[in-house]
Design a protein with these regions (language model features):
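Single conserved hydrophobic/aromatic residue that forms the stacking wall/gate
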Residues: 1-13
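Short phosphate-coordinating micro-motif centered on Lys-Gly-acidic
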Residues: 15-20, 25, 111-117, 121-179
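N-terminal pre-Walker A segment at the start of P-loop NTPase domains
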Residues: 18-39
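Hydrophobic anchor at the beta1->P-loop junction of P-loop NTPases
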Residues: 52-54
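P-loop (Walker A) phosphate-binding loop of NTP-binding proteins
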Residues: 57
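Post-Walker A helix-loop "phosphate-sensing" segment adjacent to the P-loop in P-loop NTPases
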Residues: 71-83
Length: 179
């Protein structure tokens, strides 16, 4: 199997939540506008130290959701229209926002766990808001209080769904979320 196919199979297996943990939210995302609306609704709930773990196959909408969150957070003039590219090749993109800098991280291309130390993720986890694509690459290093956002396709590969799962105060924070 190709490395890409192996990763897809691995991430697909990790998308299943434990049987004893129901998602806090399970919503349809019928179109890109719904994904953007979810990002705009999630942004005001974020604070320093939050880690949003974005799970999903290639093309599931992880970067689109991260882009919507980043653009929705208060920042310098023009932040709402700022270009927010996928960090697939740069691995990390940072954005000055309120209440904290946002680290948009894509770990898809990480082959060796030793590469993770060079990214400065401990700083991001402590002092910023981290939007993390392909978080399975972190293994045990993913903070326990991260919010897991699982983006999936239906059997036909057309309609999307999102499931949000998190401990700590995430149930309270997400209680009023209405995308």
């Amino acid at each position: 199997l190709s490395i890409r196919r192996q990763r897809q199979m691995c991430i697909r297996d990790s998308l299943d939540m434990p049987a004893d943990s129901a998602p806090l939210l399970d919503l349809p995302l019928p179109d890109p506008a719904a994904t953007e609306a979810l990002g705009r609704a999630l942004a005001p709930l974020l604070r320093v130290g939050d880690v949003i773990a974005l799970y999903g196959d290639l093309g599931a909408g992880k970067t689109a959701l991260a882009r919507a969150v980043i653009r929705a957070l208060p920042g310098p003039e023009g932040a709402a229209e700022e270009e927010v590219p996928s960090p697939t090749f740069t691995l990390v993109q940072t954005y000055e926002r309120d209440p904290a800098p946002v680290w948009h991280v894509d770990l898809y291309r990480i082959e060796d766990p030793s590469e993770l130390r060079e990214l400065g993720l401990s700083e991001a986890f402590a002092e910023g808001i981290t939007l993390l694509e392909w978080p399975d690459r972190l293994g045990d290093e993913l903070p326990a209080d991260a919010l897991s956002v699982v983006l999936t396709f239906d059997a036909a590969g057309k309609a999307r769904r999102v499931r949000l799962q998190g401990g700590g105060d995430w149930p309270r924070r997400l209680a009023g979320l209405r995308p």
